[in-house]
Amino acid sequence: MQKRAIYPGTFDPITNGHIDIVTRATQMFDHVILAIAASPSKKPMFTLEERVALAQQATAHLGNVEVMGFSDLMANFARIQQANILIRGLRAVADFEYEMQLAHMNRHLMPQLESVFLMPSKEWSFISSSLVKEVARHQGDVTHFLPENVHQALMDKLK
């Protein structure tokens, strides 16, 4: 039986930290779904369609990654996708409490859904999409933190 995992997030935009996590997940699981949440309450900079397209381009080199958008509860989406593993990145202790709450709620909604936490590589442990956007808005150089296609799209958005 194939091990199908879902790596969910808003990915607004996808960063090299996200790419690091999904790349390592592909070595652990047969099929990884990069699930991009619509998240209208977060008022994303990029539309869902743009985020999906950017992530598809940024992960094209990973043969066992499928990118798709979703707007349902994660447990419902996982059930539909026949996946029982959630990948979550943990950057710092501050992430842990929130992620633990999500993991317990997801397990309540779908008892067979396991959350697997991956630490990003040290190089990416301090970045977030929000931080990268904030630095870019103030003309800071964020080239190192984003896939090339995403960096270009971000610069175009900020013009």
From Swiss-Prot:
Pfam families: CTP_transf_like
Main location per the UniProt record: cytoplasm
SUPFAM superfamilies to which the protein is assigned, alphabetical: Nucleotidylyl transferase
GO-annotated biological processes: coenzyme A biosynthetic process
Lineage, highest ranks first: Bacteria, Pseudomonadati, Pseudomonadota, Gammaproteobacteria, Enterobacterales
UniProt keyword annotations, A-Z: ATP-binding, Coenzyme A biosynthesis, Cytoplasm, Magnesium, Nucleotide-binding, Nucleotidyltransferase, Transferase
A single Gene Ontology CC term: cytoplasm
Subunit and partners: Homohexamer.
Similarity remark: Belongs to the bacterial CoaD family.
Sample GO molecular function, one term: pantetheine-phosphate adenylyltransferase activity
Binding positions (ATP): 10-11, 18, 89-91, 99, 124-130
Transition state stabilizer (site feature) positions: 18
Location within or outside the cell: Cytoplasm
Reaction(s) catalysed (UniProt annotation): (R)-4'-phosphopantetheine + ATP + H(+) = 3'-dephospho-CoA + diphosphate
Name of the protein described by the UniProt record: Phosphopantetheine adenylyltransferase
NCBIfam families assigned: coaD_prev_kdtB, cyt_tran_rel
Cofactor: Mg(2+)
Origin species: Citrobacter koseri (strain ATCC BAA-895 / CDC 4225-83 / SGSC4696)
Gene name for this UniProt entry: coaD
Listed pathway(s): Cofactor biosynthesis; coenzyme A biosynthesis; CoA from (R)-pantothenate: step 4/5
Positions with a binding annotation for substrate: 10, 42, 74, 88
EC numbers on record: 2.7.7.3
The protein's role, per its UniProt record: Reversibly transfers an adenylyl group from ATP to 4'-phosphopantetheine, yielding dephospho-CoA (dPCoA) and pyrophosphate.
InterPro entries: Cyt_trans-like (IPR004821), PPAT (IPR001980), Rossmann-like_a/b/a_fold (IPR014729)
